[in-house]
Amino acid sequence: MAILGNKTNEVQSAAQKVKVKTTTTTIVAENHPSRNGLSIVNTGSQNVWLGFGKAAVENEGALLTPGGSWNGMHGPMLWTGSVMGIAPAGETSVTVTEV
């Protein structure tokens, strides 16, 4: 069981390692309207740019530096749409966990 705020939810799936490519946008997390939690951690050695509901583009969206993470929140709201990623400097990986 994973704890999210005051809620206890079953983790939807084990943490998934996703390879993020350099020239094409990779789907990091699918659109999931009933998502209760999301964590994306850059476990690779290259920067990753995240696009929300659209293709990821360098210098737009959110930047995850190596070792950086994003908790799925936009202000007070949990993002339930798709998350795309691109790593312009070289292929790298992120770990994604959804609740």
Model-predicted segments: where are they?
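Surface-exposed ligand/attachment interfaces on beta-rich extracellular proteins
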Residues: 12-33
